[in-house]
């Protein structure tokens, strides 16, 4: 059975929902609600930040320094945890000020600059640690279990 993509995409307990909360998004939603196969989320910040301000927030939350391309003010975000760098055009088409994902490819930097969208690469592992913790807590509460998340640092 497959669990990775459903864990990424779950609107309440998934990796994307959790990363949205860490960034300060109060109401994250799927970028394309009509296509559940697109694991990109979007949302609005309650108060505008600079791209570097958002990167600093992520650095504290994820305990790592992200790669930042671009600058300017951010209110509208799109993001996809893990290896979501291929969705940057969808984020730009949706009018996001910044696109956040786990990985970066060489072309991602060029696409960001050409499309005028800021980009933050925050680490594949770092962006996907929180969905499994949320599901663990949910299962523990529902089934009366105890659980422990063992985080093994990964530079990727």
Labelled PLM ranges:
Residues 1-156:
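Active-site catalytic microenvironments in core metabolic enzymes, especially phosphate/sugar-handling
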């Amino acid at each position: 059975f497959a669990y990775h993509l459903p864990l990424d995409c779950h609107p309440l307990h998934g990796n994307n929902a959790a990363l949205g909360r860490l960034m300060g998004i109060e109401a994250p939603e799927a970028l394309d609600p009509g296509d559940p196969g697109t694991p990109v989320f979007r949302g609005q910040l309650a108060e505008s930040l600079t791209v570097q301000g958002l990167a600093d927030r992520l650095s504290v939350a994820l305990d790592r320094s992200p790669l930042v391309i671009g600058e300017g003010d951010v209110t509208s975000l799109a993001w996809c945890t893990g290896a979501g760098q291929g969705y940057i055009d969808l984020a730009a088409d949706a009018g996001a000020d910044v696109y956040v994902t786990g990985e970066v490819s060489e072309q991602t930097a060029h696409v960001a600059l050409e499309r005028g969208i800021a980009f933050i690469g925050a680490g594949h592992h770092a962006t996907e640690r929180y969905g499994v913790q949320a599901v663990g807590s949910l299962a523990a509460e529902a089934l009366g279990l105890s659980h422990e998340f063992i985080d093994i640092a990964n530079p990727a």
